[in-house]
């Protein structure tokens, strides 16, 4: 029998913040990765994490999921400190979905087989399982590619499938790691619309990270700029664009928001 315990899904309280990183610090050897970092995701918010490669964005995701633990500070989900909770408890009990930058699916299975495989793990009711698969195929317009193996899909199609798979368990919090990386302009626009629609229609709280500000800022309510393991600025996209000179002080002249 499986050693994984059964956990009762937590009902998210009617409060503003669903996730907080409170004074979180982390070192890898002598390298300071996160330095007394504070971050908050509000209910129904789309929060963007901006920063150069190595700034600590993916590390924040790994901390939220429980893949690594902080040296100091607290990770709080739905008003509960979860530092010692393993990944399966966090993702199941607190309904966290994750869409990685690369992969997130079985390459040798078709789109439909991928959806079916994850649904069989996460949904016990057979009729709802079929309903969920069909609704995601419809929502993401996957029907033309449902019988194609994931390995043969385009970059944009793979990203759609990966997001759809993350949504099978009806998450309350969704993490999107570099969702626009290496995609063409039209595909990025489609994915931006998908992200905004997910928040509006499903009331999901979303965090997405990217190093391209102009792509991320078009679909978030608020963005936090991560530099040297700290949040050096957090504001609305409009205010960050106006405060461009302050951002260049951290990222140099190559940092372009517009």
Per-segment meaning from a language model:
Residues 127-145, 196:
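Conserved ABC ATPase "signature" region
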Residues 50-52:
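The feature captures the beta-strand-to-loop junction immediately N-terminal to the Walker
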Residues 73-82, 92-93:
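Conserved ABC transporter NBD signature motif
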Residues 65:
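Helix-to-loop junction immediately C-terminal to a conserved catalytic motif
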Residues 19-21, 34:
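Conserved structural motif at the start of ABC-family nucleotide-binding domains
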Residues 149-153:
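Conserved ABC ATPase signature
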């Amino acid at each position: 029998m499986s050693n994984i315990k059964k956990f009762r899904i937590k009902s998210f309280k009617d409060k503003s913040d669903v996730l907080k990183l409170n004074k979180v610090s982390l070192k890898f050897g002598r390298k300071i990765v996160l330095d007394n970092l504070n971050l908050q995701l509000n209910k129904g918010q789309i929060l963007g994490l901006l920063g150069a490669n190595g700034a600590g964005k993916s590390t924040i995701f790994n901390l939220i999921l429980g893949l690594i633990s902080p040296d100091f500070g607290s990770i709080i989900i739905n008003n509960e400190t979860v530092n010692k909770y393993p990944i399966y408890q966090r993702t199941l009990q607190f309904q966290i979905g994750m869409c990685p930058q690369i992969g997130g699916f079985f390459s040798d299975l078709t789109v439909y087989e991928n959806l079916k495989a994850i649904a069989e793990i996460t949904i016990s009711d057979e009729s709802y399982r079929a309903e969920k698969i069909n609704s995601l195929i419809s929502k993401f317009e996957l029907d033309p590619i449902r019988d194609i193996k994931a390995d043969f899909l385009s970059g944009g199609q793979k990203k759609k499938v990966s997001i759809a798979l993350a949504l099978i368990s009806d998450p309350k919090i969704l993490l999107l790691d570099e969702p626009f990386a290496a995609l063409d302009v039209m595909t990025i626009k489609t994915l931006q619309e998908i992200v905004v629609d997910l928040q509006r229609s499903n009331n999901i709280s979303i965090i997405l990270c990217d190093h391209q500000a102009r792509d991320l800022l078009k679909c978030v309510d608020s963005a936090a700029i991560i530099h040297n393991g700290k949040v050096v600025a957090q504001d609305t996209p409009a205010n960050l664009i106006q405060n461009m000179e302050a951002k260049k002080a951290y990222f140099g002249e190559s940092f372009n928001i517009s």
